[in-house]
Amino acid sequence: MIHWIVVLSLLSNFLFHGFAENSKAAAELTNVQTQYQFGDSLTVQAHYAFPADLKQAVLNLQTNTGTLSQFPLTISANGLLQSQISLAQQELPPFSRVYYWFDLTFTNDTSSTSPSYWFDYSDNRFTWQSNQSKWFNIYWVNGEAVYGEKLQQIALAGLKTATQILPVSPNLPITIYVYPNAQNVQDILSTTNPDWVAGEALPQVNLILVSASVDLNNMQDLERQIPHEFTHLLEYSLTMQNYSTSPAWLLEGLATNAETYPNSDYARLLQKASNSQSLIPMDQLCHTFSPDTEKAALSYAQSASFVQYLTSKYGNEKVKQLLQTPSSGLECSRFVDEIYGVNLEALDTAWQKATFNQILIQNDLFQYWPVLTALIVLIVIAVFLRRYLLKKKEKDNGLIH
């Protein structure tokens, strides 16, 4: 009996010592720090008091999108654990919250996991000015404090417009970053983004990126971009997991219709495409738009016009239903058929007939204008000739002196 008591005592001592060591290992990580240059590099480091006890150390990174990555940590003689990561190769979602923790393996083959830490991956390439309200947290680079007040006014007007297009309660406050130009926005987005992008919504972090004009007094670009990107945030709050599978023509059509100043080129592009019979079939606009600038512009123009047609004919509730209903892997055309009871091809034809019928009539008139002009001239000549003959006859009969 005494023998077993001794054995149990030694075993419990060993287990308690092991657990204590592991807890101690996690607790003795100190000076945990991160330092990064946006889009370039990230350094994560911590200090451990007993480096000789460490066999291996691993850094875990996880973004709020759920992506998990692991990186080895160097272990220096003074206990510094460090990992340097190239953000050109290991991209982090812009403005995401990044969580990280350390897995430590000891020379006795036990292991320990540290508590979780986090940092916000914001764009630190610029010196940002800010203006906060209960509605918006706005950041910009160029312009005085009064510029921030103007941005607040534009943003509030834009949100009102967006919620009229899509009546959804927004998640407040919304964060807005106003970049000096469109190229700055393109630089931080995925390399697959086309070079015509001037703004972007990041709905998972309730944030939008927009670009200012060279002339800071000209706010029209922002008055167009801000409500457009706000609409994408509203779409996301309505669709959630369905956002990425929603038809591109629907998402962009709603957002384009929310713009304070409609793009004056869109009407011209639609008429030109209709005249040349080069309209893009709507089923080809279910996914991402073409990177070609001209085709993309036509895609936006068609989407806006098509969504306007659907809303006017079937009502706004059908549009919301289309956003809220999971596609369940259905093709875009079949998905639309389930909601509207009409397939996408038939809706496309009906939209073209309703939208371009008047244009076709005008085009026919334009095509035959020489004949019409000649006919009008002949009628005018005939009228004058008749009047002349009547007057001559009256004069010959002595009725006119």
Where are the predicted features?
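C-terminal single-pass membrane-anchor helix
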Residues: L360-H401
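Acidic/His/Gly-enriched intrinsically disordered linker/tail segments
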Residues: D195, G199-L209, Q220-Q225, F230-L233, ...
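Sec-dependent N-terminal signal peptides of Gram-positive bacterial secreted proteins and lipoproteins
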Residues: I2-A20, T373-R387
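Residues at or immediately flanking beta-strands
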Residues: V58, P173-T175, D348-A350
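Short domain-boundary/entry signatures in modular proteins, especially
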Residues: F119-S130, N357-Y368
